[in-house]
């Protein structure tokens, strides 16, 4: 229906007992097998502070891939998550580019699938975000939604990188990214920025 092929379930850190998620997944499998089969993964059902909430989640990840999102602040937490039963990692450049790269490297070295998500990255933030997704193998492309929620915020950048700020058949186009500085092409973007806080 509506051409949907894949789904995910994001509990947004609201669950403390794996049995709750297991029950939902088991009921879906029993009562709505088509929906169950479309579900790629379950995302972050449990509290984001993984160190304070070391919940064994192997029973959930035995049913569906279980992705860390809010908990995946750095590679050390990804390591802890894997020990607890998490099977995948959502990377976000807004948690720092370096942190996302290190988490990606650790996860890849331990056969954990990746996805790249955003928090509605507008303007220049969109560029390193999509570049990360282009260079780490993800399970389903990249989540990018700033053009959906506030399209006008990125108008100066979209004039230079139109394919990055407008989806076409579910895809963004990275072909205009080139040159130094993440390929931003700052000299061509007509955006007034405040003066830097620190001069080096």
Report each predicted region and the residues it spans.
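Flexible C-terminal active-site loop/helix
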Residues: 120-200
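Catalytic core of soluble alpha/beta enzymes
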Residues: 1-120, 124-126
